[in-house]
Amino acid sequence: MRVGIVGATGQVGTVMRRILTERNFPVTELRLFASARSAGTELDGVTVEDAATADYTGLDIVLFSAGGATSKALAEKVASQGAVVIDNSSAWRKHPEVPLVVSEVNPHAIKDRPKGIIANPNCTTMAAMPVLRPLHDEAGLEALVVATYQAVSGSGLAGVAELHGQTQKVVADAEKLTHDGEAVDFPEPGVYKRPIAFNVLPLAGSIVDDGLNETDEEQKLRNESRKILEIPGLKVSGTCVRVPVFSGHSLQINARFARPISADGATELLKDAPGVELSDIPTPLQAAGKDPSYVGRIRSDETVDNGLALFVSNDNLRKGAALNAVQIAELVAAELKG
């Protein structure tokens, strides 16, 4: 397969390159693309090309992870030159002619791609889908209440640098925060609205200007869950929270079903679910650098009929972005080979 990566020098693009190698993806030719600023540099012996001016003719699959604006500008052009585009941004997820795919959940959806583009879900949605699919198949999912605990790497390298820098700056005096949240002078926040070190921010993403006071992250969770699980009427209430963790998103999920399902029954279903691993105490540190969605703390939710509560942790850079894109590419490669 002749493969391209747009955004190859970025955080997710770097992980994509690593995962292609780890999974022995059948790459016969690899081309790397990034901004004009990075063009001409070398990565693993491959010269990076300017994504905006490159000719993509001859490529079979192109993975995009360079942000929504780049995907909007280039994805259709690349698809028109013959490649199947797998896009990691939010640019195409809601488009009715673009399938939104989690490899273990709805792989059949890749076949219906009239625009030649397949979208990768948001990282928080991605973590939940392999867990919710078997539960929905068993009991009929009706509603979700979700609180997320999202790592700073979800904001890119700048988020990682901000947490690291703030932590280094104040760690020597951090004990003073025990009794007074203003006892330490934090560096001025840049990426986030408030200091992220030793703190929790109930605002992951940006407020959408539609009067609902939800963030785009919260709306992605609702819209993408409906599309992937093929439940257009699914009710979803999310609160997306940024936490001082470098990598690994976690979700507390309270789910309501149409039919009874016990905690033991759910555990049995999830034991063999693809992309899922049971864990007594799932944590982002456990998930970082790993592929599965780790799920635990499975119990009944007594506030609703047929309710379950559970906790999920997943690496937002691997399965939450790069791994799923490569897994979709594997499905496409198998199809193209016939």
UniProtKB/Swiss-Prot annotation:
List the Gene3D superfamilies hit by this protein, alphabetically: Dihydrodipicolinate Reductase, domain 2, NAD(P)-binding Rossmann-like Domain
GO biological process terms, semicolon-separated: 'de novo' L-methionine biosynthetic process; diaminopimelate biosynthetic process; isoleucine biosynthetic process; lysine biosynthetic process via diaminopimelate; threonine biosynthetic process
Residues engaged in binding NADP(+)? T9, G10, Q11, V12, R37, S38, S153, G154, N316
Keywords in alphabetical order: Amino-acid biosynthesis, Diaminopimelate biosynthesis, Lysine biosynthesis, Methionine biosynthesis, NADP, Oxidoreductase, Threonine biosynthesis
What's the domain of life for this entry?
A: Bacteria
Q: What is its EC number?
A: 1.2.1.11
Q: Which molecular function GO terms apply here?
A: aspartate-semialdehyde dehydrogenase activity; NAD binding; NADP binding; protein dimerization activity
Enzyme class, spelled out: oxidoreductase
Question: Quick one: which residues bind phosphate?
Answer: R93, K220
Task: Provide the active-site residues from the annotation.
Answer: C123, H249
Residues that bind substrate, according to the entry?
Answer: Q150, R242
Question: For this UniProt entry, which segments traverse the membrane?
Answer: none
Catalysed reactions listed for this entry:
L-aspartate 4-semialdehyde + phosphate + NADP(+) = 4-phospho-L-aspartate + NADPH + H(+)
Per the record's keyword annotation, is Amino-acid biosynthesis included, yes or no? yes
- Pathway recorded for this protein: Amino-acid biosynthesis; L-lysine biosynthesis via DAP pathway; (S)-tetrahydrodipicolinate from L-aspartate: step 2/4; Amino-acid biosynthesis; L-methionine biosynthesis via de novo pathway; L-homoserine from L-aspartate: step 2/3; Amino-acid biosynthesis; L-threonine biosynthesis; L-threonine from L-aspartate: step 2/5
- Summarize the protein's role: Catalyzes the NADPH-dependent formation of L-aspartate-semialdehyde (L-ASA) by the reductive dephosphorylation of L-aspartyl-4-phosphate.
- What assembly does the database describe for this protein? Homodimer.
Similarity annotation: Belongs to the aspartate-semialdehyde dehydrogenase family.
Its name, as the record gives it, is Aspartate-semialdehyde dehydrogenase
- What is the organism field in this record? Streptomyces akiyoshiensis
